[in-house]
Design a protein with these regions (language model features):
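Alpha-helical recognition segments enriched in aromatics with Gly/Pro capping
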Residues: 1-34, 49, 99, 120-268, ...
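Conserved beta-strand segments of alpha/beta enzyme cores
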Residues: 4, 61-63, 111
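N-terminal, positively charged nucleic-acid-binding surface of large information/translation enzymes
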Residues: 10-13, 19-105
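General alpha-helical segment detector with a strong preference for membrane-spanning helices
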Residues: 42, 71, 210-212, 274-277
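Non-catalytic interaction-recognition regions
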Residues: 56-58, 84-85, 94, 98-124, ...
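Residue-level detector of short coil/turn "hinge" positions at structural boundaries
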Residues: 61-62, 86, 108, 136, ...
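Short, solvent-exposed turn/loop segments enriched in Gly/Ser/Thr/Pro and often Arg
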Residues: 64-72, 114-116, 231, 258
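Positively charged, low-complexity/disordered segments
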Residues: 271-273, 277-283
Length: 283
């Protein structure tokens, strides 16, 4: 059977040919665990589950990695509001998320890395980006310099003005360019953080997936997946971080296919109002 997958990178359906016929490797961006999973999270998990099941009918070995983001501003805020240690909060909601996915008959990933277990790899990646001239440190922050990556916008197809308007990143005075984004930021007491060459701080969200996907799967791998809402800025920034370290800046140095599921339409103001764990078990 010929398997075709819509590749966001090219905007077309392409015949799927793995990097290595004997081992297909897939990375999916997983949840940020500060609350119950909502139906939007489930939508993405079900789409990934379908993809993995199809791949496993065609190839002998498929490794499926999906991360857990367990350090994030939303997590810090939730832990503060609940007066609960961050580790306890994220462990609890990771367990509930996995239980919810199992209830939906969604297979858990072969590898489920937690961001906080890979801070060393993130610091190493930042160091490489600084040494290559793609990142810079200012006022305790380390930022990726977007103009240094010649193919920025290759995934989202956004022009320069759209990139800045849609980045959802505050234009801070220490940025060299308005589109530059955070790789590392300081953590003032009592915020959580780690020691680094740039002071006590924590990683930016985009950096986490670049570091964890390379650590768990190696480069290049076959498919990077997520919801359409992650195309920009998250996945665009992942490509920039990873591929700027290669001389030709080719996105194929990272992942060959980018698989994105559509957003789920829901009548509530937010899909977060329909959390899976609040639904009756008989549903």
């Amino acid at each position: 059977m010929v398997l075709k997958i819509h590749n966001t990178l090219s905007g077309t359906k392409e015949i799927f040919k793995p990097v290595d016929e004997s081992h297909v490797r897939v990375y999916a961006c997983g949840p940020t665990v500060y609350n119950f999973a909502h139906i939007g999270n489930a939508r993405m998990a079900v789409a990934n589950d379908l993809l993995i099941n199809v791949l496993r009918t065609q190839f002998k070995k498929v490794t499926y990695v999906s991360n857990i983001t367990d350090i994030d501003d939303k997590i810090i805020e939730a832990a503060h509001e609940l007066n609960e240690p961050i580790k306890n909060l994220t462990t609890k909601y990771t367990k509930i998320y996995n239980e919810d996915m199992s209830y939906l008959n969604v297979q858990l990933p072969d590898i489920q890395p937690r961001a906080t277990d890979h801070i060393g790899e993130m610091i190493d990646l930042i160091t490489k980006l600084i040494n290559s001239g793609n990142a810079y440190e200012k006022n305790g922050h380390v930022l990726f310099h977007v103009p240094s990556y010649s193919k920025y916008g290759v995934l989202s197809k956004r022009n320069r003005d759209e990139q800045i308007a849609g980045s959802r990143v505050e234009v801070a005075p220490f940025k060299k360019d308005p589109a530059d984004f955070i790789l590392w930021k300081p953590s003032p007491d009592p915020m959580p953080g780690w020691e680094s060459p740039w002071g006590f701080g924590r990683p930016g969200w985009h950096l986490e997936c670049s570091a964890m996907s390379e650590k768990t799967l190696g480069l290049p791998f076959d498919i990077h997946s997520g919801g359409m809402d992650l195309v920009f800025p998250h996945h665009e920034n992942e490509i920039a971080q990873t591929c700027s370290l290669h001389t030709n800046h080719d996105p194929d140095n990272f992942a060959h296919f980018w698989f994105h599921n559509g957003c789920l339409l829901y009548t509530s103001p937010s899909p977060r109002d329909a959390t899976l764990s609040r639904m009756p078990s008989s549903a």
